[in-house]
UniProtKB/Swiss-Prot annotation:
Encoding gene (name): thiE
Protein's name according to its UniProt entry: Thiamine-phosphate synthase
Family assignment from sequence similarity: Belongs to the thiamine-phosphate synthase family.
Record has Isomerase as a keyword: no
Highest taxon above the source species: Bacteria
EC number: 2.5.1.3
Entry's Gene Ontology cellular component terms: cytoplasm
Molecular function terms, GO-annotated: magnesium ion binding; thiamine-phosphate diphosphorylase activity
Length: 207
């Protein structure tokens, strides 16, 4: 059975060089991130393999899950904990067959509970809803109501909130029932990533 994704879920931004990426990821993990998703949309396979391998090492050192965005082959090659798939990123059932019963497979469900139902039926182990707040990373994303987390709980789903989450609004997502909060800018654009991670992770200690 796949492990649940819970607490602070760090998602790396595009375009960072190795040193900056690894330093910020280490800070997020030290601050309390319990999972980290490697998101890199470049076509440089060598860069992606190199960065993913080091990020996985950091996650192992901190006891955190390591998830690869949109690349089942890379996740399989390095033995990542799992993969996250968006609407156009691949087939959930095929990823489950390839990665096995214990892999974490996440699915972007945007603002639609029916996508969550379909993803779970296909073999997803968690579903992500967003943007729950206005997002700089995806400014044109549809707004996902926080009521989706009660709907997801009724399905027995491991549910993740994403989109515009920062220390000042994270509590609203947690109180609505999100099992995890996926954060990009609120962590990696912060002046102090470790401190931002502690503040975000702290919402789960209070629940």
């Amino acid at each position: 059975m796949p492990p649940r994704v819970e607490g602070l879920y760090a998602v790396t931004p595009d375009g960072l060089d190795d040193a900056r990426l690894f330093a910020l990821a280490a800070a997020a993990l030290a601050g309390g991130a319990r999972a980290l998703q490697y998101r890199d949309k470049s076509g440089d396979a060598g860069r992606r393999l190199r960065q993913a391998a080091e990020l996985q090492r950091l996650c192992r050192a901190h006891g955190a899950l390591f998830i690869v965005n949109d690349d089942v082959e890379l996740a399989e090659r390095i033995g990542a904990d799992g993969v996250h798939l968006g609407r156009d990123d691949g087939d959930i059932a095929a990823a489950r067959r390839r990665l096995g019963a214990d892999a974490v497979i996440g699915a972007s469900c945007y603002d639609r509970i029916e996508l969550a139902r379909a993803a779970l039926a296909a073999g997803a182990s968690y579903v992500a809803f967003g943007a729950v707040f206005p997002s700089r990373t995806k400014p044109h994303a549809a707004a996902a109501p926080l009521s989706l987390f009660a709907d997801a709980a009724a399905l027995g789903a491991n549910a993740v909130a994403i989109g515009g989450i920062a220390a000042g609004n994270a509590g609203r997502a947690v109180e609505a029932g999100a099992d995890a909060i996926a954060v990009i800018g609120g962590l990696f654009d912060a002046d102090d990533t470790a401190a931002a991670a502690r503040a975000l992770a702290g919402w789960f200690g209070a629940r």
